[in-house]
A protein has these predicted regions:
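Short beta-strand/loop segment that forms part of the nucleotide-sugar
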Residues: 26, 31-40, 61-63
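Short, well-formed alpha-helical segments that are part of the catalytic scaffolds
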Residues: 12-29
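The conserved acidic donor/metal-binding loop of glycosyltransferases
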Residues: 97-101
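A short acidic, amphipathic alpha-helical/loop segment
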Residues: 21-22, 47, 109, 113
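Catalytic-site signature of metal-activated, phosphate-bearing donor transferases
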Residues: 71-78, 82-85, 103-322
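Active-site-proximal specificity loops/subdomain of glycosyltransferases
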Residues: 3-6, 10, 41-95
């Protein structure tokens, strides 16, 4: 079995992503690692090119994203992942984002499970445990799904994209999504239907326990924490650092992610305090000091927050430690 890892990068230096550690972890258990750059202008692409000169397992390419396109979100995410995937020459593919890491202790477990799935041709897509850090003080979120799709068979019909039932078109024929996808679903290119996948556990049971833990049930919270620790011991686990530096994440949301989601879902949202889920003021009035103060408070008073609604400081969200 040959295992290909793949990922995408864009201005990772300026955005302070742990991209080098992420790619190094892929190199630790993959036979090749394919990386597509979206047109970085902060030195990321140049550093990747230098790295490529000394690392024989790296396969790199650049596809410059047009950030003025109305569908730049889909172009820079789902489609860009597909471009990276199509560089893969292995039997199996492992996709990872550049704010995710597999630790060295999990390399052998990862290879063993990949080989097991490779020898079961009925499985085309497999999920793996995920822990998402909230701040730098050891909190792990319980308000997000504890898994991600990561291992797939290198079937050339499989791409990343918007499932057909959630795909819409603008008047200029560019594509956007309805709520329910981030454009990175594993779908079949010809039918735009979702690729069936295998879960690593009884996720209905775990999500029910997680819901009770989120609601404040201490017994459920203890069970969920012990289950998470057990999964980490048994299976390779994705460690997600998206919210590890909350201040950085909020700054990125101000400059990029708020526009990204408008592009993804074809929304036009005015910059008002009512539409800002993080602050009671428009983004144009938010200062770096505002961001620093909010990040400190979120890290110390909350265990996570999904910013589909304004922060409710009276509803203290739960977290676990591992």
């Amino acid at each position: 079995m040959k295992l290909s890892g793949y990922t995408t990068v864009y201005n990772c230096i300026n955005n302070e992503y742990p991209w080098e550690d992420s790619i190094k972890s892929l190199l630790g258990f993959c036979d090749e690692v394919c990386v597509v750059d979206g047109g970085s202008d902060d030195g990321t692409w140049e550093k990747l090119q230098e790295w490529n000169k000394t690392e024989s397992k790296l396969v790199i390419d650049q596809y410059i994203v047009d950030w003025n396109r109305p569908d730049f979100a889909y172009e820079s995410d789902g489609r860009q992942k597909t471009r990276s995937r199509k560089l893969c020459s292995g039997d199996m593919c492992w996709q990872m984002d550049v704010d995710e890491i597999i630790v060295q202790e999990d390399y052998e477990k990862t290879r063993n499970i990949c080989l097991e799935i490779y020898n079961n041709p009925q499985i085309e897509l497999m999920t793996f445990p995920l822990i998402e850090y909230w701040g730098s003080n050891g909190k792990v979120r319980i308000d997000v799904n504890p898994w991600k799709w990561r291992l797939s068979r290198n079937n050339p019909k499989i791409i990343h994209g918007i499932p057909g039932d959630l795909l819409k078109y603008r008047e200029d024929n560019t594509e956007y999504a309805l709520q329910g996808t981030d454009s990175c679903d594993y779908i079949y290119e010809d039918t735009k239907t979702r690729v069936p996948f295998v879960l690593f556990c009884d996720m209905n049971k775990i999500n029910n326990i997680r819901a009770h833990a989120n609601a404040g049930n201490q017994q459920a919270l203890d069970f969920y924490e012990n289950w998470t620790k057990s999964m980490i011991n048994q299976m390779p686990t994705i460690r997600h650092y998206s919210w590890h530096n909350i201040e950085r994440k909020i700054k990125n949301y101000k400059t990029h992610w708020s526009k990204f989601w408008c592009s993804m879902y074809n929304k036009s949202i005015d910059d008002t305090k009512e539409n800002n889920m993080m602050f009671d003021k428009p983004w144009s009035e938010v200062t770096d000091n505002d961001i620093k103060e909010l990040a400190f408070r979120l890290e110390n008073e909350m265990g996570g927050w999904i910013f589909h609604q304004k922060i409710d400081w009276d509803r203290k969200t739960k977290s676990i430690t591992i």
